[in-house]
Amino acid sequence: MANHTTSIRVALLLAHASVCALLLLSVTASGQTRTTTAPAGSRCNAAAAEPITFVPMPGHPFNPAVSSDGCWVFVSVTTGNPKSVDGVALLSRAAGQLKLKQVFMVEGEPTGSVLTHDDKLLIVADGDYVVFMDTARMISGRGDPMLGYLSDGDSSGSVYVNVTADDRFLFVSDENAQTITVINLQKARAEGFKPSAIVGKIPVGYAPIALTFSPDGRWLYTTSQIAPESYHWPVECKPEGADPATAKPRYPKGAIIVVDVARAETDPANSIVARVPAGCSPVRLAIAPDGARVYVTARNSNALLAFDTTKMQGEPSAALVGTVPVGTSPVGVAVVNGGRQIIVTNSNRFASNQTARQTLTVIDAAQVAAGQAAILGQIKAGSFPRQIGQSPDGRTLFVSNYNSSELEVIDLTRLPIERAGQH
């Protein structure tokens, strides 16, 4: 897999990007001609004309990653069609508008992604591989941006990635392998992204996804959708998508797993310090700015769960401090507005109608112990809202509406909440 870019593919991608850019202009009602070089950060983070903008994407968007200056959004996209493009869409952001600049082909099925803190690398989970791309080349259009594909195991199902604050280590959720792979990113960069940079694997259980660091970088929180048999937890959860009236419980709850980051960097197999029951099929996780609470979407419980992080290691049975019923099959979660609110995507991903538009639920973080009373209202979304990204200034939210092939852009300073009974 040494060379994944050909002149034919580049031509196809450029043509494809041009078509999508025209679509974008029609939706955002922009008549301006903008350059493709990054404007000043203040222009990049300017407010849009409307509180919500739906930007069409060239495929199903999975994850938006935003540059530290807010000028660029990198979105992993898949099509499910072997004749179409799977890759990373690059969008420039200026004067409150997004413009699709180019789509870069990636072999496989790109899903979770992250930018290193120096903004130099875009790292993408890609099934059996982790993909490394040069962001400067992507933005300038000069040179091949593909730096390497690193295999972390056959059929591993790499789905999510995150890096430590110092960019020294990379963590990869292997959904099929039931592990978290730890990679020495410094070594990978120096040696051409070879498997020799893999430090080892953390055994976590069925379908791990979330990779969220505590603010001080000491702990990594991940999720296992179904706890391993070795935990000896009771069977409480019904199969997802089954008729809740007739289905019987078949699985134990899933878990939040707490990892000692320093230990994981040298001895991954022995780095787990806590396992906490977290509802049925916990998937994504966000943490409060002060690190005092973590919030997890329990997809098969149709709920957001809140946990006290100080109790997760010492008193895991007492760590749950709130359960908020949200919409159907919640997936994405973000803590916004300085930790005062939580936003959850209600994916409804197992519904028979996969094109129906869904909602986001907005929650008062101070009231999570009150359950449903903590809900402030809803925000309109596309079909299968999946993943949430934020601009570095905390003023803009990016939601990947997977089935409707849209990137939803929300102005958090003008949060367009629809309250119960509001029309």
Pin down the residues of each PLM region.
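Sec-dependent N-terminal signal peptides
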Residues: 9-21
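Predominantly soluble domains enriched in secretory-pathway, periplasmic, or organellar proteins
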Residues: 16, 27-423
